[in-house]
Regions:
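Hot-dog-fold acyl-thioester-processing enzymes
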Residues: 1-28, 87-106
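HotDog/MaoC-like acyl-thioester-processing domains
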Residues: 40-44, 52-106
Length: 106
């Protein structure tokens, strides 16, 4: 669901700010959040994030979530899945993180 995807985007934001700044920073806001395709229990997601702009203390991040494996609703075998090729874009967003100047790595 949407809250689950936003939580995963937050995890990616934390990883990216640690990689860039050596500090997890604070996710200040999401903007332009779009939920494009439904996600169901049993689906597997690939989450991508990229720092697209670095300011003095702010970092703008673009996020995308793709469904890569889909659960098949099958009465005979409730654990059936299929690989999606190509993956399906299910959500995208951008967000801003803030890392205080004294917390940034040199």
């Amino acid at each position: 669901d949407g809250a689950y995807i936003l939580n995963l985007f937050g995890d990616i934001a934390t990883e990216l700010t640690i990689r860039v700044d050596g500090d997890e920073g604070l996710l200040r806001a999401y903007d332009n959040v779009e939920f494009i395709s439904p996600v169901y229990a049993g689906d597997f997601l690939l989450i991508k994030g990229k720092v697209v702009k670095i300011g003095n203390t702010s970092r703008k991040i673009g996020f995308e979530a793709y469904k890569i494996i889909e659960s098949i609703k099958n009465a005979k075998n409730n654990s059936s899945c299929k690989i999606l090729d190509p993956p399906i874009l299910v959500a995208k967003a951008s967000g801003t993180t803030v890392v205080l100047k004294d917390k940034q790595k040199c």
